[in-house]
Amino acid sequence: MIYFFISSLFFLILITLMFSKNIFKNIKKIKLFSKNNFFFYFLLFVLFIFIFWLVVYTDQGIKVANQKIIYFLTSYFLEILLSIDNVFAWFFIFKSLKIPLIYQKKVLLYGLWGALILRSIFSFSGSFLFSKWHWILYLFGGFFILTSLKFIFFSNLECDNKEENIKKLWIYKFFRVTENINNENFFVKIEKKIFITPLFVSLILIELSDIVFSVDSIPAALSVNNDLFIIFSSNFFAVLGLRSMYLFTAYFLKNFPIMKYALSLILMFIGFKILIEKFFTFSIFLTLAVILIILITTFLINLIFNLKKC
């Protein structure tokens, strides 16, 4: 399987390079959500699953191949769902710094590289830590439950001056930052001094938000399975998917706000799953079934509320 891991990793990097080369050449022509983007992402996703299943089937048989696919899909759904709040963070950052949509694309696409590198580091280091000191996973289990409860009961408490507070961050204390953006430049020279632009500030903040939101998503994926390739590849597609469907995801969350509570319930379920694993083991099929039931139920409830409003 080590050869499969290496070849598959090369495949993912190659696809990313091809994708990045294309999008950076035509940065102003890209739509953050379009039929072409969605078709490309979906085709890549299906192609990967098929190749993954075929190689595992050839090497270890159909039973293991089917199980690995279920592991991948469960990890992928977890990564998507637990990272989806990141989209709200992106909107808040862009709105606060007054970044036009045309330049938001550049930040998200450059940020794709940083997100993949950081999540890869977290995946490998997390897998090592949990294999050496398994009890650390129980700490995350308790953390997941507390986080979900905090979100359910205190999610409506907001600060009134969020947009002003973003300009009081450490970035503004340690760097010279221009008041306005300078086209698509990250750096500008003013009176022989180098300044960073709000566009670069937004890139830094979005990378930091990726780190924050990966704190729960990666341990959650590790609680489902410890296959590094599955964790890495599910992370890859989750990160790529959220960025390629940025506007659609934001629109969906805005019009289906109850879905945010589904994320809390899923996080709570994962927390309990980790804490009671010594007494009761959830099969991967049961785990995936619970996640889908929570999602479908909350979606239908939200849909009913939306229809009643109309």
UniProtKB/Swiss-Prot annotation:
Main location class: membrane
Name of this protein: Uncharacterized membrane protein BUsg_160
Mind listing the UniProt keywords for this protein, alphabetically? Cell membrane, Membrane, Transmembrane, Transmembrane helix
Q: Which InterPro entries match?
A: Integral_membrane_TerC (IPR005496)
- Membrane among keywords: yes
Task: State whether keyword Lyase applies.
Answer: no
Which species is this UniProt entry from? Buchnera aphidicola subsp. Schizaphis graminum (strain Sg)
Gene Ontology cellular-component terms listed: plasma membrane
- Which compartments does it reside in? Cell membrane
| Pfam families given in the database record | TerC
Topology in the lipid bilayer: Multi-pass membrane protein
Q: Which stretches are transmembrane?
A: 1-21, 38-58, 74-94, 110-130, 135-155, 194-214, 228-248, 256-276, 284-304
Q: Which family does it belong to?
A: Belongs to the TerC family.
